[in-house]
A protein has these predicted regions:
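Conserved proline-anchored active-site loop of SAM-dependent methyltransferases
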Residues: 69-84, 135, 341-355, 498
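A conserved hydrophobic secondary-structure block that centers on an alpha-helix together
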Residues: 41-66, 74, 85, 104, ...
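Mobile active-site "lid"/loop adjacent to the S-adenosyl-L-methionine
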Residues: 72, 79-101, 114-116
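Accessory, often C-terminal, charged low-complexity segments
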Residues: 1-30, 43, 48, 64-68, ...
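Small/polar loops that bind or transfer phosphate-bearing groups
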Residues: 52, 122-123, 343, 372
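Conserved SAM-binding loop and adjacent beta-strand
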Residues: 313-324
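Short, glycine/acidic-enriched loop or turn micro-motifs at the edges of active sites
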Residues: 58, 80, 127, 346, ...
């Protein structure tokens, strides 16, 4: 807030990451600001985030030409079809309706990805099988990666009628499994601590691995004599991992460990200095590693002065995902710091929050596209993005500085698009007046007239009225409001629309 005693210039200088919402300013200011920014940058390339207020099917269609083959990582958290969600995409769909919601959008999202693109989708037991089947139709069964299990709760539900539901799934597909590989995760302190130098090996700390494997080979089934003279055979039905000749080479190179007394089962020494710079992701993610539902709720609520900025009722219906969970997904699928991430069931904006935080952490330039259709867009998603750009940490809707009085803001340009609905388009069709011709037709003729003539001929000028391009910045449409049957005359940006359609 700018107090009357403050100079606007000094306030701006001391708050360099405070967002300016250009929609709140006159058109002349918007034009001047965008022109100034365009002088130094390609504004489209400099844009960090794109927030689209729209039905996801319409939004994905709009993105096709501009972003085809560019989205490295897709994460969606669609409705779980359980009856517990009160948002615009209502849970408790009939299976067929829910399947249509998903199947209409997955192919469009698939077109936006390169061959090494990765697709993640959160889901629970109710629709996990159906979601995988639908996604397979587009990505192909051969490109299924894994079903990740996420431990979403930190305590059991003792009042559960049957079993305590403590996990969700994250279904994972890639566009081409032959070329996609997961980015390695940072090695944790706990994992690093497991490496010890028990024998003062000059190569440094090491841990030991099993020398036996279950894929049996006669060549690798041989007895091993320990330094103390014990004879060791592979476990029943197994064999050693290496041939006898290779084993003897490893013994000579001090890469086999027989325990401190030299009498134990041989194990392979794996040196910390030789392992990959990171660890391969597992398919079981615990809440200690990636957070839980309550953590996610607290992260979202902390951004708002609940009861004033946003209602308690609205936030109580939210089902956000924890930032640590999304960070894990980004580290696997979008570690490259110029990746583009898409979430077309954006909800409260957790995906954008995670991308902004990761960029803040590693100075990355990742970009994000979020799509959400309900009032949640204006009340939660957009304000949340504005806030996490300005400051890393929040409490009760107030930014929290660190010990050095830094808010850790980041520079961002975020574009906000609002698309008219299909219903709005139909409501703005202007038909030729043919008097009482329609009233004189019988029912069969009326239907034939509607399908074969009226939409094709009488509404032709509405479908692409070239006259509006004489003044493209003044084009308007009647857009439905929250009141039943009410509309409001609003400006439509034809130039921006055609830029997206043309790519």
């Amino acid at each position: 807030m700018l107090f009357r005693s403050e100079n606007p210039a000094s306030f701006a200088e001391s708050n360099p990451y405070l967002t300016v919402d250009t929609s709140l300013f006159p058109a002349a200011f918007q034009t001047a600001l965008l022109a100034a920014l365009s002088n130094d940058h390609d504004l489209d390339e400099a844009t960090d985030g794109l927030l689209i207020h729209s039905d996801n099917f319409q939004a994905l269609n709009l993105l096709q030409a501009r972003y085809r083959g560019q989205v490295k990582c897709i994460y969606i958290d669609p409705p779980y079809n359980t009856g517990g969600d009160g948002f615009v995409y209502k849970d408790n769909y009939q299976h067929s309706s829910w399947a249509s919601l998903i199947s209409n959008t997955v192919p469009l999202a698939h077109y936006l990805q390169p061959d090494n693109g990765i697709f993640f989708a959160s889901i629970d037991d109710d629709e996990q099988v159906l979601l995988r089947q639908i996604t397979e139709l587009t990505y192909g069964k051969q490109n299924f990666i894994n079903n990740v299990i996420w431990q979403k709760k930190f305590s059991p539900s003792n009042d559960a009628k049957w079993l305590s539901d403590n996990h969700d799934f994250i279904i994972t597909f890639t566009k081409n499994k032959e070329i996609w590989r997961p980015d390695l995760l940072p090695r944790s302190d706990k994992a690093t601590a497991s490496y010890k130098n028990h024998d003062n090996d000059p190569r440094g700390a090491w841990t030991s691995g099993d020398l036996s494997v279950k894929t049996y080979s006669v060549v690798n089934d041989y007895p091993i004599t320990t330094p103390t003279g014990n004879i060791i055979y592979p476990p029943a039905g197994a064999c050693w991992r290496v041939s006898k000749e290779k084993f003897e080479e490893m013994v000579a190179d001090n890469r086999i460990y027989f325990s401190k007394n030299g009498a134990g089962v041989p194990r392979i020494k794996r040196f910390l200095s030789e392992v990959k710079d990171g660890v391969t992701p597992l398919t079981l993610w615990t809440y200690e590693e990636v957070g839980h539902n309550q953590e996610a709720k607290k992260e979202m609520v902390a951004c708002f002065n609940v009861g004033q900025e946003v209602s308690t009722e609205l936030l109580s219906k939210a089902t956000p995902k924890p930032i640590r969970l999304l960070n894990r997904i980004l580290m696997i699928g979008a570690k490259a710091n110029d990746s583009l991430i898409l979430d077309y069931f954006a909800g409260s904006g957790s995906t954008a929050h995670a991308v902004i935080n990761l960029n803040r952490e590693d100075d990355g330039k990742r970009k994000y596209i979020l799509v959400e259709q309900g009032e949640y867009f204006d009340t939660v998603l957009k304000p949340r993005v504005q806030k996490v750009v300005y400051a890393e940490n929040w409490k009760d809707g107030k930014p929290q500085a660190d010990k050095e009085s830094s808010l850790h803001g980041v520079p961002q340009i975020v574009k906000v698009l609002k698309l008219e609905s299909y219903e709005d388009t139909l409501n703005n069709l202007v038909l030729k007046d043919n008097g009482d011709l329609f009233a004189k037709l019988n029912d069969g003729a009326k239907e034939d007239y509607l399908l074969r003539y009226m939409l094709a001929d009488q509404s032709r000028d509405s479908l692409l009225n070239t006259d509006v391009f004489r003044r493209p910045f003044n084009y308007q449409m009647d857009i439905a409001t929250n009141s039943a049957g009410a509309t409001e005359r609003m400006d439509i940006d034809l130039v921006e629309t055609f830029n997206y359609l043309l790519g």
